[in-house]
A protein has these predicted regions:
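Alpha-helical/coil-rich non-catalytic "connector" segments in signaling and regulatory proteins
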Residues: 1-121
């Protein structure tokens, strides 16, 4: 099973992502959730997730700094970015830093998320 850490400062988004799919049938397990990048880094160092699904705009540490710091620390995990933030430069930075892809929160669907997960797997 691929271990997944969900990182978003909006509780409703974390709940929606958890309930959107039958994660186990796709070969994934949600090992935890975090509310900001700093909390996610601490959890990732303990849990070693295979995938971190993260927002870009969060308090304390945003998604860009989370990806950058995780890569600097040689954490071996994939990143899938979800956000309402549509600024191309911000998204491009996440992709250049190594995010696998980017999904807009407003358009996320079970089908789109499943497609992204299958690409990562």
């Amino acid at each position: 099973m691929y271990q997944v850490l969900i990182v978003d400062d909006e509780p409703i988004v974390k709940i929606a992502l958890r309930s959107m799919l039958d994660w186990g049938s796709l070969g994934f397990h949600i090992c935890g959730t975090a509310s900001n990048g700093q909390e996610a880094l601490e959890m990732a160092e303990r849990m070693h997730p295979d995938l971190i699904i993260c927002d870009l705009k969060m308090p304390v540490m945003d998604g860009i700094d989370l990806i950058r710091t995780a890569k600097d620390r040689s954490m071996n995990c994939e990143f899938l970015v979800i956000s309402n933030y549509e600024d191309f430069n911000y998204v491009r930075t996440a992709l250049v830093l190594g995010a696998s892809d980017y999904i807009l929160k407003v358009s996320i669907s079970p089908e789109e998320l499943t497609t992204q997960l299958q690409k990562i797997k």
